[in-house]
Amino acid sequence: MASSPHKHYLDEDFDAKEFIETYFSHGKISIIEEHVGFPMKVLHEVFSSGKVRGDALLDISVGAIIYQLFSASNNFKKMYVMEFKDANITHFKKWLQKEEGATDWSFVSEKFCHIEGIRDKLQEKDQVRKAIAGVIKWENFENTPIDTQLVPEVDCVLSLWMLAVISKTKEAFQTNLKKFTSRLKIGGRLLLFLGMNVLL
């Protein structure tokens, strides 16, 4: 995911639902396939291999997206979702608590069931919800590490697109990457999806 279209991600007037519907659910088919279809297929292959599993996973992905958690919920007892913006946390919790105004992720459930070869879409969504142990705000992320009181050590850190969005320079990218993995256990796994224009 290119970072330039999302340069206003951290602005105060950021619209969480509009962001999702533009890039992840109601946009052009080619964009949806790049941002949703491709990661889901890759994550299915990774998690179904059985090599990435454990007690806890930390997700630090862009926006209030949920599709990356479907395959992960098969392999981890607890999943922690971390965000920087109140708007995204509020919108994510609408889906989590089945509230009115939440993004309709039915197409993700259907795609996941097709990939996994299963039929019960409702059961899968409930499995994801039950595995989410916390939705946590990372306060002042630019200047502070992840709060060790809020997030335990985890077996896997999963991040889709976020580093590309918040890192304006190579140095910022390296600093943010260290922060993202600060709660990762020794021997744990990092699953990272980046934009094509990220300078490494």
For the regions a language model picked out, list residue spans one by one:
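Class I SAM-dependent methyltransferase Rossmann-like catalytic core
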Residues: 1-54, 67
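Conserved class I S-adenosyl-L-methionine
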Residues: 52-65, 78-83
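Conserved SAM-binding loop
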Residues: 92-93
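S-adenosyl-L-methionine
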Residues: 97-146
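Short catalytic micro-motifs in class I SAM-dependent methyltransferases
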Residues: 139, 158-165
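A short acidic, Gly/Pro-enriched loop at the edge of an enzyme's catalytic core
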Residues: 142-157
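A short glycine-rich, Lys/Arg-flanked "PGG" loop and its adjoining helix->strand segment in the class I
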Residues: 150-151, 171-186
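Acidic carboxylate diad motif detector
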Residues: 192-194
